[in-house]
């Protein structure tokens, strides 16, 4: 359970993408392109190296899930990582209420198709809205939410999180 009242918007990013919103969603929903286009993300989330977004996308997932604890076969973040950032570090700030879920999955996604997805990570939440501007253009608006304690910590470098996500979304 997450108490959003304890969060503040730490960064907002907007970009117009020259594609139909349906194409954007399709690209977001699969990971066939991830190893080649997003090598940094595929390193952080080893399952993506296999062009999968969920272990259940593999036809033999029920057999594989019990054979190997490697995140490349089970999902989740690479060993030692806590969040989606350049170095995988949450810099000492984690969302305590979801840590059990984060240990096995690495992230939680909630989509309200066709206009928004929410990513919950080890130390932050990212909301991305898609606003169709025409048949061949969609505006992306991404907002990063951080717990107030995190965003007020002078030692927390939010660019580690924000810049990593922008690299992936760009």
Positions of PLM-derived features:
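C-terminal catalytic domain of Rieske-type non-heme iron oxygenases
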Residues: 1-170
């Amino acid at each position: 359970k997450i108490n959003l009242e304890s969060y503040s918007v730490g960064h907002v990013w907007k970009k117009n993408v020259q594609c139909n919103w349906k194409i954007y969603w399709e690209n977001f929903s699969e990971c066939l392109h991830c190893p080649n286009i997003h090598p940094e993300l595929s390193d952080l989330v080893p399952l993506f190296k296999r062009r999968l977004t969920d272990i259940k996308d593999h036809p033999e997932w029920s057999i594989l899930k019990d054979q190997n604890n490697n995140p490349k076969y089970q999902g989740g973040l690479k060993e030692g990582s806590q969040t989606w950032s350049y170095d995988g570090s949450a810099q000492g700030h984690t969302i305590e209420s979801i840590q059990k879920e984060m240990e096995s999955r690495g992230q939680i996604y909630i989509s309200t198709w066709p206009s928004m997805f929410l990513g919950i990570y080890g130390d932050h939440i990212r909301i991305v809205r898609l606003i169709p501007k025409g048949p061949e253009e969609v505006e992306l608006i991404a907002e990063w939410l951080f717990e107030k304690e995190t965003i007020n910590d002078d030692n927390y470098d939010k660019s580690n999180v924000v810049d990593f996500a922008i690299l992936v979304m760009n």
